[in-house]
Amino acid sequence: MAQMLARIHALDLDDKPFESWLDRSQLSPPPDASRADVWREAIALVAEERVPTRTCFLHRDYQHFNMLWSRERLTGVVDWSEACIGPPEVDVGHCRLNLTVLFSAVVADRFRAIYEAESGHRVDAWWDVHTLLSYGPSWTQFLPIQIDGRAPLDVEGMTGRMEEVLERVLRRL
């Protein structure tokens, strides 16, 4: 997945400009947070607008639900309705968010490391935090519907896994 994303980000295309989906004025630790301090630190970090140091063509909803697989090989990426030009960390962070809530912070960090190796670019921790903060209470409601029993899902552990990945990113600063 990280290799495909590096290839997408290498495309030289013009498209609509990036607009953040994150409403900073509405950010707060999730109600079930056990580490509100981690959330507050992450929220404080992204309080000010930041200009990306690098932009590229983005999928904008890059995650395994939008990938086509054949014999354990990634063969395509679907759902390009939100594609735009913006910081590559938005795609990386969105995929990492999904990998974290569904699996673990370790899996999300492995994805980032492979992406960095494949793309030749280090993921800016600020943009990573910015995108990871898209997580909220609605994730525990819509993911079970999206998964629809096709795989095990630990809804109660999602926020804790997000706290772990945020803490790991904040240590990278």
Residue spans for each PLM region:
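Hydrophobic/aromatic-rich alpha-helical bundle segments in the mid-to-C-terminal region
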Residues: K16-E19, L143-R161
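Non-catalytic, C-terminal membrane-associated alpha-helical segments of glycosyltransferases
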Residues: L132-Q141, G157-R161, V165
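Regulatory N- and C-terminal appendages and interdomain linkers associated
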Residues: L166-L173
